[in-house]
UniProtKB/Swiss-Prot annotation:
The record marks 93-94 as: Reactive bond for chymotrypsin. Glycans are attached at residue 1. CDD domains: beta-trefoil_STI_CPI-like (cd23372). It comes from Solanum tuberosum (Potato). This is Aspartic protease inhibitor 6. Inhibitor of cathepsin D (aspartic protease). May also inhibit trypsin and chymotrypsin (serine proteases). Protects the plant by inhibiting proteases of invading organisms.
Length: 169
């Protein structure tokens, strides 16, 4: 299973790879936040692997995202992406780790073509539980960035989704 870095389209201060970091005010025993570096000059992002619900990895398909790094047993679940609870300060939900693979919960995402360049990430609940005949993307939300304590944190947004590319590691 290949690993990829999620890199942004922008350069300089508009750039920055996605990485696993410690969430402010978190009491989790392991890094538990999904962030983006403040510039494309500097460290590379944390590699991820995409785990499809079924079959291969394609656009517009439900999948889990896992940071693909060596870790101690205690921290294994802290590598799987999920959408956290509503954050009152940001009035949205932040991306964090602690998700599950293959479970009908808030750990599913999709990769879709951006309206500009590259791709966007969507957070999509496992909709067959909610509504059998609904269009699948009806409940999906775009992933973008909010600034948390000076760091760029991935979060659900209404506008300006993060445009990304994938670089095989």
């Amino acid at each position: 299973n290949s690993s990829y870095r999620i890199i942004s389209i922008g350069r300089g201060a508009l750039g920055g790879d996605v990485y696993l970091g410690k969430s402010p005010n978190s009491d989790a025993p392991c890094p538990d936040g999904v962030f983006r570096y403040n510039s494309d000059v500097g460290p590379s992002g944390t590699p991820v692997r995409f785990i499809p619900l079924s079959g291969g990895i394609f656009e517009d398909q439900l999948l889990n995202i896992q940071f693909n790094i060596p870790t101690v047993k205690l921290c294994v679940s802290y590598t799987i992406w999920k959408v956290g609870n509503l954050n009152a300060y940001f009035r949205t939900m932040l991306l964090e780790t602690g998700g599950t693979i293959g479970q009908a919960d808030n750990s599913y995402f999709k990769i879709v073509k951006s309206s500009k360049i590259g791709y966007n990430l969507l957070s999509c609940p496992f909709t067959s539980i909610i509504c059998l005949r609904c269009p699948e993307d009806q409940f999906c939300a775009k992933v973008g960035v909010v600034i948390q304590n000076g760091k760029r944190r991935l979060a659900l947004v209404n506008e300006n989704p993060l445009d990304v590319l994938f670089q095989e590691v």
